[in-house]
Regions:
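Bacterial N-terminal signal peptides that target proteins for export
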Residues: 1-12
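Bacterial N-terminal signal peptides
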Residues: 11-22
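Boundary at the C-terminal end of the N-terminal hydrophobic targeting segment
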Residues: 24-30
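STAS-typified acidic loop motif
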Residues: 33-66
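Second-shell loop/turn segments in exported
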Residues: 52-59, 82-89, 108-114, 153-161, ...
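Extended, non-globular alpha-helical segments
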Residues: 70-71, 76-104
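Charged, glycine-interspersed solvent-exposed loop segments at helix/strand-loop junctions
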Residues: 81, 147-232
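Glycine-rich beta-to-alpha active-site loop
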Residues: 94, 103-147
Length: 234
């Protein structure tokens, strides 16, 4: 937490003039439109009770709204609902909102060899009751926040206070998802760098990003590996 706050002091000083934490702030409207994320239903077979949702591009409030709507729409007909991720990052608060819905719906998260999951996307990956990432395709990166909320009319001190609050929310969120403290610590350390730190297979397991939620696994054991009743997760 201390390292995170130290980096936030530097970031807060940057906010007023440079808005370094959000690349979208410096883009033209056309570029922003091109960079918008998309959400689609993937491989849905209601008779076989399989299917998922795939997310491509930056994670924003609009993307989260679409994803939540699709997840809820197919959840009653799917046993192992999977959320496939390919995102360079995005809005931290939006990512945690999506993560909360994913965990509520007992969905899996996955990043295949053709995808990527950096920055805020890692918060979404962390929410899966089972997490299946491809090594070297998941990376820790400096977090981005909604510019309108964090920059407009804020002094450096006020901005730092807001970032401190968000840091605590991220820490609490990861703990609630059952991830080790080490993940938050390493995400915090990455705030001081503009580079992406790719995670190999061993690191993904150490940080809890490759594996299952213990509570989910316990439920499966106690119920002879049956899936939770779909009606209970609506």
């Amino acid at each position: 937490m201390r390292d995170f706050l130290r980096s936030l002091k530097l970031c807060a000083a940057c906010l007023v003039g440079l808005a370094l934490l959000s690349p979208l702030a410096a883009q033209s409207p056309a570029d922003q439109h091109a960079a918008e994320g998309t959400v689609n239903i993937y491989n849905l077979d209601r008779d076989a009770h399989v299917g998922g949702v795939e997310i491509h591009g930056p994670i924003s409030k609009a993307v989260v709204s679409q994803a939540v709507e699709l997840i809820r729409s197919i959840r009653p007909d799917v046993d192992d609902l999977k959320v496939f991720l390919s995102s360079p990052g995005g809005d931290v608060l939006a990512a945690m909102e999506l993560g909360e819905e994913i965990r509520k719906q007992w969905a899996w998260t996955a990043v295949d060899e053709h995808g990527e999951c950096f920055g805020a996307c890692v918060l979404v990956l962390a929410a899966g009751v089972r997490r299946i990432p491809a090594p070297e395709n998941v990376g820790l990166q400096r977090m981005n926040f909604d510019q309108k909320e964090f920059v407009a009319s804020l002094s450096p001190d006020k901005a730092k206070q807001k970032y401190t609050g968000v840091a605590k929310r991220v820490e609490t969120y990861l703990a609630r998802m059952g991830l080790p403290k080490k993940l938050f610590q390493e995400m915090a350390a990455q705030q001081a760098s503009a580079k992406v730190r790719l995670l190999d297979a061993a690191k993904l397991k150490t940080l809890g990003l490759d594996g299952s939620d213990p509570a989910y696994e316990q439920w499966l054991r106690e119920n002879s590996n049956e899936q939770p009743a779909r009606s209970n997760r609506e």
